[in-house]
Structure formats: C-alpha cells, structure tokens
Amino acid sequence: MNTRLLLRNLLEPVYRNHTGFKQQLKSVQGGLDRLRTGASERFPTLIRPNPRNIYLTLTSACNLRCKGCRYGRDFMPNEQLSLQMVREVLEDAKEANFEIVRLYGGEPLVHRNIVEIVEECSRLGLRSYITTNGIVLKKKIDDLYAAGLRRLSVGVYGIGEEYNTYVQRKDRFSQLEDNLTYVRDRYGDKISMVLNWLLMKPTCSLDVVRDTWKFAERYGMPIFINLVHYSLPYFTMGYDDDLQFKPEDRPAIEAVVNEFLRLQAQQPQLLPMSPTVLRSIPDWLVKGANMRVPCDRHKLIWVGADGTVQMCYVTFKLGNLHEKRLRDMLFTDTHVNAARSAFALNCPNCHCGYDSRTSGHAPTRQQYMGS
C-alpha cells in the first residue's frame, strides 16, 4: 500500500464527520499538486503515470435516451464488460494501489452483475461508487447496500419537464424523485448521494439554478457542476448544436456562476466546490480547446464497455482487455508517453477534470482567485 493510500485510510474516520478538517486536508493536497505541476512544467520528464481512479463503463445499455449521449446507439452498441473481466480488472487495480473505482455506463444498474461487482470491490477493499440516472435505484439499492455500496452520484439534467425533454422519455423526472425519496427514507445519510448537474445551454438560467438548489436541499445531495462536452467521443452537440455554448452566451454563464456563488455563501455544504473553480467555468465553456491548463489525467484509467483501456475518456489508448490484462498495460512506455502528452495538451484538450486542473495549476488558480 502506498503512503498516500495508507494516510487516507488512517485519517478517513477522523475527517468523515469533520468538514473543516477535510477541507484543510484538501487545501494541503492542492498545494502539493501545484508544486508538482509547476515542477513538471519546467521538467516534463517528472511526469509519470500515477493512476488513482479507474472508471469502468460496465455497459453501453441505458434506460434513457439523453440528447447528448451516444452510448448504446452508435457508440459501442450492445457492449458490456463480463463479470470475469471486471473481477480481473479489480484485482489488477488493487495490486496497483488504485484508490477509487467508479462504476458507470450507459446505465450501470442495468448490468445483470452489478451487485456482484460491488461485492467484489468490497471484498478487495476498493472504494467504489456508482454513477447512475437513478431511475431503477428503488429496485436495486437494498442489494447494493448489502453488497457494500455507500456512495452514489446521480445525473440531473434539468428539473421537471426540462429533465424529461433532455432524456427524451415521459414522466422520468417523477420516477427519479420517487427513487431518491426511497433511498433517503430507507437509508438516510448512510448512503452519500452527489447531484451531478450538467451545465449546458438548456440549463443555463437562474430559474433552473434555483430549482436545482431546492432539489439538492430536498434530498441532501451536494452539487457537482459538470460542463457540457465538446470533444468526448460518446457525446453529441445536440440537435443543431442546441446544447453547446457560443461566445455570446458568456453573460448568461457568468450570471449562473454568480448565482451559485451567492447560494454557496448561504449553504456551502450544498456546493463543495472551490469558488476559484466556479469562477473559471465561463472560460472553460467559452474558450473550449483554447483553455490551456495542464491535464492531470495521468491519475486516471478509463475502461470502455468493449474492453478498450485508455488514460482518459477521449484518447491515449493503452490496449484492450480482450487481448491482455490491465496489469500488462500499466506503467509501460506507452503509458508514460501518454501521461506526458496529456500534460502537455497534445490531445483534443477537453475540460475533463476542470476542477482539479484549475486548483492544481498555480497561474490558473491565481487568475480566478477573486478579490
């Protein structure tokens, strides 16, 4: 076990219920990240693969049909990872000291072995969470909780009919409410739920922000702001690019960010994102690939439903699980070169990890610190 993982395991029981202490630890970690990033800009050979998180796309299948998503349609249709393949990946991740396993899709809860996969994470002592649309949580959560699941992140793409319009299915928002109510009523705060809110053109309004805040209050779900993508291979621009922002949308984006900052000042526990990161959002959305901030995806491994293994969502392919084990793809020359190319932005330069990239790069952080 590496030093970082050992310290986290020792300190977690202390900071779990002490938000202030947790924020202090995050501040220290941010300072260390900035030192490493600064040194690596001067000496690129310092960049090495350091995978901490692994994202497993368990299946391309989904029970919704979101406007911006291509999963299961023309992106990896009819693909899913087998239980045996997932077990081997998790064993290799444990051996390589990965810290967090994200289970997602598609919709991971429609994978027939989702409970066994969570059980395997628990058996190996890997911290796992599921990213879900929440539509079938009520049917699955009891077995998942028994298997050891304690963390969920739930995608929210609007409130009420705005949500139904985006997912292109009737009455799904009311189903989402019913499922979240069941989880909260049955398990209270024994299960952590994060609200993954997507900031795109249809949700970029003060009314939507305020409605989303009330929704987060209702279910005790801290908000993380995801930004609409322009370079992910499984994400579309919508119909006539109706999801994407243009330069003339900057005032509306800034108004939304300012409203989040106002609400955060009143209830910081509902938006545990740095104000510095929030202030950077308009530039991330408007500048797109011209937002030149070193990438930290050398800390990630992404696995597609067809077995593809990459260092990030978009590019830097390392191999395929149908051909070799994960352990044989890690820390190779290909992996090292990918880490250095990503850091140097020799890639499509998406905004994945915009929060850690902003806070982990001293000049960028300084730019958005505010007065």
Where would I find each of the regions flagged by the language model?
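Generic structural signal for small/hydrophobic residues in well-ordered secondary structure
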Residues: 58, 62-63, 82, 176, ...
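Radical SAM enzyme [4Fe-4S]-AdoMet core and its adjacent flexible, acidic
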Residues: 1, 5-12, 143-310, 314-320
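Residue-level marker for beta-strand->alpha-helix junctions and adjacent short loops that shape enzyme
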Residues: 61, 108, 135, 159, ...
